[in-house]
């Protein structure tokens, strides 16, 4: 009977001896009961009742003994179970329920166990009977082995509610059952003494060992396969070692055993146009398919096939042309090959000559550049006779000064920061440190914008006086806003590039952005009698920093103001005419200008004639159309301008013919 001991009692030798003595006494009692079974049935019933009472008392008092050996079966119970035929009617409570397994109830109600474990009872049988039944009969050895392998936990059956199969048993009910057991044992142990390490014991109870023999009862019976597939993974949700089961490796299903060919055969392709089977279809694109008797099932499908085939041909890259490298006969005739050899020899000779001349040119360093040019160039007789360039005098005066006795006095002056700037080196700066003005001893002056870009530069000209150039505030390629010269000629420009104000020694004119002249004037001191009105001052703002003031011919100035710094440069001119009557009036209008004005009047007359023909298609009305009044006034003004400008008579006659020409 040594192999029926509890596995939890191996550690304590005193308890082992006590267990062995208990088992021997129980064995003797069971042997006596077997011998006197037929005669003393009533005594056995009383002994069974006494044993049940002792089990209840032992559960309440001796909890530690139950914890040490929860899986041990008493021999008395075993003998009773083996004699099932005799006690089937008398002891229905002692029958072992091995046919079905029930799940624990979710309720915490305590149900007393129907089975009882044997305790130590004094034996009244003689020692001879004990020795005669020390081992099991051979007929029960097999049953004993099977029972030991199943290792049924009787303590689990206490709180099981009959009628609930394992198929509906849940983890929650099973864990709740274990929790109820721990709570009941905890209450019973508190009555006697406080446990030493209660928390550690509770943790041990909650941890589930997957290899524990208690789990065997769930699959050692008639539904082992169902348990393995359904419930065994769920009982391993609280592993004591290793990661959670959700992180465990799960091998993917393999597709080796699947026959895809069968699946393809089951779903055969259908034509979207006529619905016929396409398994017999042979396409030029699908090379792997087998050729069939017919190409397509309908015309629409055949058109689709042709379109796909054409697109495939278009997108297909051209085949690479391979060069034949096999030995072959010589290309061309012998004459061609000889000519090719001669050309190759000629090229080699030319290369040698070129290298030879290069060496000679390096050695002959005493030759002059003219000699080398003569050797390399071909000269002609006419190319040697190069005409001399005419020297053009850079005179800024008007053409009237060439034949007249005029004297011009420049009125140049510079004022910076309220002080007159003399011919000396001077520098001024803005408040933030950048340069404002630089003046040199020769009269050159530079004025800068606050951004550092050049605004005004004043340099001396070749004749007399200075020239001022005004630029816009741009770092690269700035546009010129004005060019003013102290010798009498100046011009200012609009932002679009058209002339704004033009001045010469005789007068000036003012124009708008489109280039139309608004007014013109003559200087009062140059010509005594003038058909023009007297001069009125002109003020121009070239940008936010620079302005131009024209008060008189000798009072023309450029002003600059930025960040509290101010500068002014005067570029006026005084002209003295000993005989003003000798200078013709408006001599600056040439004959070509007058011819252009006459042609303009003629063009406008033609446009008026075309407009009349469009509006009045009848030819009778054309003769009644008259010339517009504004064209007649322009013609009269042009004739008067020709007389006042003093042009030649032949030019005057040509202008009249253009104006009076019949259209």
Curated annotation (Swiss-Prot):
The keyword Nucleus applies. It comes from the Eukaryota. It is found in: Nucleus. GO terms for cellular component: nucleus. Residues 112-132 have a biased composition (Low complexity). Keywords: Nucleus. The keyword Nucleus applies. Residues 1-74, 106-136 are annotated as: Disordered. Residues 20-69 have a biased composition (Acidic residues). Belongs to the ERICH6 family. This is Glutamate-rich protein 6. The lineage of its organism: Eukaryota, Metazoa, Chordata, Craniata, Vertebrata.
């Amino acid at each position: 009977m040594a192999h029926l001991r509890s596995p939890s009692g191996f550690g304590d030798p005193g308890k082992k001896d006590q267990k062995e003595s208990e088992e021997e006494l129980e064995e003797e009692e069971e042997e006596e009961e077997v011998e006197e079974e037929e005669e003393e049935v009533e005594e056995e019933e009383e002994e069974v009742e006494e044993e049940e009472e002792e089990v209840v008392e032992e559960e309440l008092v001796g909890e530690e003994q139950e914890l040490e050996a929860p899986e041990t079966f008493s021999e008395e119970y075993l003998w009773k179970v083996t004699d099932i035929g005799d006690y089937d009617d008398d002891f229905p409570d002692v029958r072992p329920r091995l046919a079905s397994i029930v799940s624990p109830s979710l309720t915490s109600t305590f149900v007393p166990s129907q089975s009882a474990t044997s305790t130590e009872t004094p034996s009244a049988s003689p020692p001879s009977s004990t020795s005669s039944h020390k081992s099991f009969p051979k007929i029960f050895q097999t049953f004993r082995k099977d029972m030991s392998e199943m290792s049924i936990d009787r303590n689990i059956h206490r709180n099981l509610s009959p009628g609930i199969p394992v198929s509906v048993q849940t983890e929650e009910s099973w864990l709740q059952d274990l929790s109820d057991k721990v709570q009941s044992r905890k209450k019973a142990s508190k009555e006697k003494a406080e446990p030493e390490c209660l928390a550690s014991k509770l943790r041990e109870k909650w941890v589930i060992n997957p290899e524990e023999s208690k789990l065997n009862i769930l699959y050692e019976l008639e539904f082992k396969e169902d348990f393995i597939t359904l419930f065994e993974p769920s009982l391993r949700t609280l592993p004591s070692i290793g990661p959670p089961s959700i992180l465990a490796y799960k091998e993917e299903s393999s597709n080796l055993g699947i026959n895809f060919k069968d699946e393809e055969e089951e779903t055969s392709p259908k034509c979207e146009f006529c619905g016929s089977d396409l398994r017999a279809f042979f396409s030029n694109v699908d090379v792997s398919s087998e050729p069939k008797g017919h190409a397509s099932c309908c015309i629409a499908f055949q058109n689709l096939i042709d379109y796909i085939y054409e697109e495939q041909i278009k997108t297909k890259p051209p085949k690479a042309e391979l060069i034949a490298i096999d030995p072959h006969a010589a290309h061309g005739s012998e004459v061609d090959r000889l000519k090719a050899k001669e050309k190759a020899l000629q090229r080699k000779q030319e290369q040698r000559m070129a290298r030879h001349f290069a060496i000679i040119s390096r050695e002959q360093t005493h030759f002059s550049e003219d000699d080398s040019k003569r050797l390399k160039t071909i000269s002609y007789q006419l190319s040697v006779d190069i005409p001399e360039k005419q020297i053009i005098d850079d005179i800024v005066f008007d053409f009237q000064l060439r034949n007249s006795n005029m004297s011009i006095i420049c009125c140049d002056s510079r004022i910076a920061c309220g002080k007159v700037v003399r011919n000396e080196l001077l520098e001024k700066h803005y408040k933030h440190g950048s340069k404002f003005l630089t003046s040199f001893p020769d009269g050159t002056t530079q004025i800068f914008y606050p951004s550092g870009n050049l605004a005004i530069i004043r340099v001396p000209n070749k004749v007399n006086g200075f020239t001022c150039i005004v630029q816009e505030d741009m770092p690269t390629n700035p546009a010129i806003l004005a060019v003013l010269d102290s010798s009498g000629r100046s011009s200012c420009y609009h932002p679009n590039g058209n002339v704004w104000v033009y001045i010469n020694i005789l007068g000036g004119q003012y124009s708008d952005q489109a280039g139309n002249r608004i007014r013109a004037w003559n200087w009062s001191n140059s010509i005594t009698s003038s058909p023009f009105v007297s001069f009125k001052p002109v003020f121009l703002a070239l940008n936010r920093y620079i302005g131009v003031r024209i008060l008189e011919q000798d009072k023309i100035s450029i002003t600059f103001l930025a960040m509290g710094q101010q500068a002014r440069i005067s570029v006026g001119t005084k002209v003295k005419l000993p005989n003003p009557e000798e200078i013709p009036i408006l001599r600056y209008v040439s004959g070509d200008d007058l011819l252009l004005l006459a042609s303009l009047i003629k063009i406008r007359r033609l446009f008026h004639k075309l407009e009349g023909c469009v509006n009045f298609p009848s030819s009778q009305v054309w003769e009644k159309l008259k010339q517009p009044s504004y064209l007649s006034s322009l013609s009269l003004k042009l004739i008067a301008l020709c007389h006042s400008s003093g042009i030649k008579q032949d030019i005057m006659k040509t202008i009249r013919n253009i104006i009076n020409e019949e259209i």
